[in-house]
Every structure is written in C-alpha cells, then in structure tokens.
C-alpha cells in the first residue's frame, strides 16, 4: 500500500496548493479495487505536518487496517460512493469557496461555457437536503446515499462532481490526482458561473451542440484532444 499511500498523500497536499482548503478542511481518498482497501487522509491532521505514512487504510466496511490515526470523518461517504460506482478510483471533498457557495444556495452549478463542458457533461448537480433523521442517524453514510440518489444511473465520470446542499462539493476521478484535478476545475467553473450570472443574470446555458463537441473531443470514443 506504500505507493497508494504516497499518491493519496500527494493528492491531499495539492488541496492547499490549489487553494481548495482552509486549515484541515477537506480530504482525498483512493481505492485499491483488487484488495478492497481504501487509503484516506487522517481526521484533523494539519497539512503542514502530515506525512505519507499518516494516511489511513480502511476496508470497505470502514475498519482501520493500517495507520495510527482515525480516518477522515467523511470516510463513510467515500466508501458508499466506491461501493456504488466501480469506475471511481479517487474521491475528494473540500469546502472551496465558490463551489460551496452554490451548495449553500441549493443550486446546481450551471454549464455556461466551454471550460465547464471540457470536464462536466451538463450542470454540476446539487443534492436535496438531508432530513433531520438522516443527519441524526448515519450522517456521513446518508450523505453518500443522497449523492447516489441525485446521480442515479448516470456515469459518474461524465459529471465528476456534485455539490451537497448546505454542505459543499465532492469530486471524483480515475485516481486521487484525477479527482483533485476535477475539484480544481469545479471550483473554477463555479467562480466563472457566479461572475457570468452577475454580469448577465439572464444568461442561458451553453448551446447543447457546443457542449457535446467540447466534452466528446476530450472524453468521447473518438476523442482527439491532447496526445496519445
């Protein structure tokens, strides 16, 4: 697990680097599908002092199998998403300012331009609010369940992120670094959408044909963006 712990550590350290977290907010995980183990950031450990060896390894039930610290308080959310979506290799949760503002407003982040369409096929959805019973019960597990409820049977890598109502953004990807990359983009397009709607409150969504072109040229079966 040393390689995966190093990858998860580096991905977690990218969160303050890209301005996505304050203090100890936020966490990144990655999964070893063959072994059924997840590596995740320890709860409440400062980024300035954190080391790769501090990463916590848990099984799919959340039991710690390696590590001296307690895992992130959001571990149950990560595990629920890994169980539901086999294509996910890494997950990140932050409270980045603009994406969290959309979550607090209870609004999806609208697809307004090609920057958004290069990564997200349509609006970045916002979940419903959790009930008092869901919050007082298994809160983190139920957060995962409400994300799944919102995504349904959609391919999660086509819209690799969501905002949880009154909480904040979750993003995911093929691995931990890909998940962080998508979280950075989510924050940027959330900021762009806020600015654009401030300039033009009547601004419509991106044209569907333009969105399709930009997403498919990067992610479709005949993608041609970048190098092979």
Swiss-Prot record:
Cofactor binding comment, as recorded: Binds 1 zinc ion per subunit.
InterPro entries cross-referenced by the UniProt entry: Aldolase_class_II_sugar_metab (IPR050197), Aldolase_II/adducin_N (IPR001303), Aldolase_II/adducin_N_sf (IPR036409), UlaF (IPR023499)
Active-site residues (renumbered): 118, 225
GO molecular function: aldehyde-lyase activity; L-ribulose-phosphate 4-epimerase activity; zinc ion binding
Record SUPFAM superfamilies: AraD/HMP-PK domain-like
Disulfide bonds: none
Required co-factors: Zn(2+)
NCBIfam families named in the record: PRK08193.1 (NF006047), PRK12348.1 (NF009003)
Protein name, UniProt field: L-ribulose-5-phosphate 4-epimerase UlaF
Species in which this protein is naturally found: Escherichia coli (strain SE11)
Underlying gene: ulaF
């Amino acid at each position: 697990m040393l390689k995966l712990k190093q990858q998860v550590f580096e991905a977690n350290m990218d969160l303050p680097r890209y301005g996505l977290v304050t203090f100890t907010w936020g966490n990144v995980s990655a999964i070893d599908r063959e072994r059924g183990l997840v590596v995740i950031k320890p709860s409440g450990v400062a980024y300035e002092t954190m080391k790769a060896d501090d990463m916590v390894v848990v099984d799919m039930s959340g039991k710690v199998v390696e590590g001296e610290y307690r895992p992130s308080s959001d571990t149950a959310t990560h595990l629920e998403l890994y169980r539901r979506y086999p294509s996910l290799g890494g997950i990140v949760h932050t409270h980045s300012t603009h994406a969290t503002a959309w979550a607090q407003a209870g609004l999806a982040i609208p697809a307004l331009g090609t920057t958004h369409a290069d990564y997200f096929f349509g609006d970045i959805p916002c979940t419903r609010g959790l009930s008092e019973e869901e919050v007082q019960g298994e809160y983190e597990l139920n957060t995962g369940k409400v994300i799944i409820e919102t995504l349904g049977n959609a391919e999660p890598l086509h819209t690799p992120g969501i905002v949880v109502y009154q909480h904040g953004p979750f993003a995911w990807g093929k691995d931990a670094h890909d998940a962080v990359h998508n979280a950075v983009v989510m924050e940027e397009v959330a900021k762009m959408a806020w600015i654009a709607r401030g300039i033009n409150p009547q601004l419509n969504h991106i044209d569907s044909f333009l969105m399709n072109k930009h997403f498919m040229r990067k992610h479709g079966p005949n993608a041609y963006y970048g190098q092979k």
